[in-house]
A protein has these predicted regions:
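A long, amphipathic alpha-helix that forms part
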Residues: 107-110, 114, 146-190
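Histidine-centered active-site microenvironments of extracellular/periplasmic hydrolases
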Residues: 182, 187-234
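Membrane-interface soluble catalytic domains
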Residues: 231-354
Length: 354
């Protein structure tokens, strides 16, 4: 992370892995009311930024398979020419129900990318799953488990030592992947995005009370963007800009120098035109709370009749709705407008609508 750009306020637009994949690929938050949008035949066809990568070979790599939540259909239906590589493709053995481990998956990915024509560009999504129950951590050269104190586990939202070490294992695997990429050569012309499908539970204690009361932890993940220094694309550091999964593909296209049409809600995080109007919408199925993150503020509609406003860095965690009525009214209206727009776009952004 020290050699990358870390976005501290990056969020999943909706919770569960299937909703995260849909939101990232389509650029529209998955707010399908009952089941996930991936299972809804009326919304699986979308116009996506991924198809603007003309001339790129496209891959989706997963240690297990995509035979769940209709994910295979979402991917194949929306990204033209996509090769989906699953557990049967890999030489490494399965470790658990999620297929091969993150370490082995990334090792296989490195071999694949290293074998390609370096003059031909590629776009790849690698879905890792070792940091997921049952938290399988096999013996791996260079990695050793560590025991955290119970206080640290509680402060950072971990439920067990196994969960904590599986996170460390995935982090180790990603570090090894970057090292392999450098040795293989393609590193020097590749942009890496590292982010999560969703966050931990709501039990974190190491954050300001304003953040805790906003109930953002289940959707909060890091975003790390990394590229070789000689490309001159990334200035290592930290950013507090609000960002979310829908922004990933527009940002990748912008950094890659691709001129693209954007029918989604995602925005290029490096496009300065949007710096004064960056908000993150977080929703989900019916009954899920709605959040709107705007700078250091979070509007929260808990769907139970309570509407609140918090400042994320506020150590008191006080509800500021009454103290800042204009800001509260503005963010409330914006959240309601975005929610209505997203629900419309789910059904009205088909490729056939060009």
């Amino acid at each position: 992370a020290k050699e990358s750009l870390l976005f501290h306020r990056f969020f999943a637009n909706a919770r569960t892995t299937a909703r995260a994949i849909f939101s990232t690929i389509t650029g529209i938050p998955d707010v399908n009311l009952s089941s996930t949008a991936s299972r809804n035949p009326l919304v699986v066809d979308q116009r996506v930024v991924g198809n603007e990568f003309t001339g790129y070979d496209k891959y989706y790599l997963i240690g297990g398979n995509t035979a769940w939540a209709n994910i295979r259909s979402i991917l194949g239906q929306n990204i033209q020419g996509l090769r989906i590589l699953e557990e049967d493709y890999w030489k490494e053995p399965r470790a658990d129900v999620w297929g091969v481990t993150d370490y082995d998956l990334l090792k296989e990915a490195d071999k694949l990318f290293a074998s390609r024509d370096p003059q031909h560009p590629f776009l790849a999504v690698i879905q890792m799953a070792s940091y997921h129950s049952p938290y399988t951590v096999p013996k791996t050269p260079g990695f050793s488990e560590s025991e955290a104190s119970q206080e640290d586990l509680s402060n950072y939202g971990f439920e067990s030592q196994k969960e904590y070490n599986s996170m460390r294992y995935t982090d180790f695997a990603v570090g090894e992947f970057i090292r392999w990429a450098k040795a293989s050569g393609y590193y020097h012309n590749t942009i890496f995005f590292i982010f999560g499908d969703h966050g931990l539970n709501d039990k974190v204690r190491n954050m300001p009370r304003g953040y805790v009361n906003s109930r953002l932890a289940p959707w909060h993940t890091p975003l790390i963007i990394h590229a070789a220094p000689e490309l001159g694309l990334i200035t290592p550091g930290e950013s507090m800009l609000p960002a979310s999964q829908v922004d990933v593909f527009p940002t990748a296209a912008g950094l890659a120098g691709i001129a693209y049409n954007n029918w989604t809600l995602g925005r290029d995080l490096f496009d300065r035109r949007y710096d004064g109007s960056r908000q993150v919408y977080i929703g989900g199925k019916g009954g899920e709370p709605i959040h709107l993150v705007d700078g250091d503020y979070c509007y929260l509609d808990n769907r139970a009749g309570e509407l609140r406003l918090f400042r994320l860095s506020d150590p008191t965690g006080e509800d500021l709705a009454a103290q800042e009525p204009e800001r509260f009214a503005r963010l409330r209206q914006m959240a309601e407008d975005m929610d209505a727009t997203i629900r419309y776009m789910l059904f009205n952004n088909r490729k056939s609508a060009k």
